[in-house]
């Protein structure tokens, strides 16, 4: 499953890069803002979220509170500009979700993940990998905010 996801992400990045380079519309200001290299790419840290070993130690109510804290932490990291993309996987697999961090190192990303209540509680665990992808991924939060309906 993880291999399939990585292949898909790499393919999409390559397709986006190839399509963009064919248009010939280079925006130096945007490239600098997004910290893109000469081919429009940058390094990220990708986190794979797995079910942790301590899930069974918590009641349904406790897990619900941990999940609320997890979601609040996601919002906090996104507001800081560190968490660029996050989302769950479908199904009941042990692989629960993914984060993409704008982090300079694995250590920085690990420090960010260690602020998550679900990680602290052992309900989730993270596997971190450096990933080289399109700098355009940095625009996901801005675009997503324009697509998400306001809460009532």
Predicted regions and their residues:
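Bacterial Sec-dependent N-terminal signal peptides
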Residues: 1-24
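Conserved, structured core segments of small domains
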Residues: 22-152
């Amino acid at each position: 499953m993880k291999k399939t996801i990585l292949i898909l992400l790499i393919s999409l990045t390559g397709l986006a890069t190839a399509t963009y380079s064919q248009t010939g519309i280079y925006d130096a200001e945007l490239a600098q803002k997004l910290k893109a290299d000469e081919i429009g790419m940058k390094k990220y840290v990708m986190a794979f979220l797995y079910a942790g070993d301590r899930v069974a130690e918590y009641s349904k109510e406790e897990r619900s509170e941990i999940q609320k804290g997890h979601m609040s932490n996601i919002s906090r990291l996104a507001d800081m500009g560190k968490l660029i993309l996050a989302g769950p996987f479908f199904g009941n697999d042990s692989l629960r979700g993914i984060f993409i961090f704008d982090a300079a190192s694995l250590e920085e990303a690990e420090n960010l993940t260690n602020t998550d209540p679900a990680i602290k509680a052992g309900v989730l665990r993270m596997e971190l990998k450096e990933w080289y992808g399109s700098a355009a991924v940095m625009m996901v939060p801005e675009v997503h905010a324009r697509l998400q309906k306001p809460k009532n």
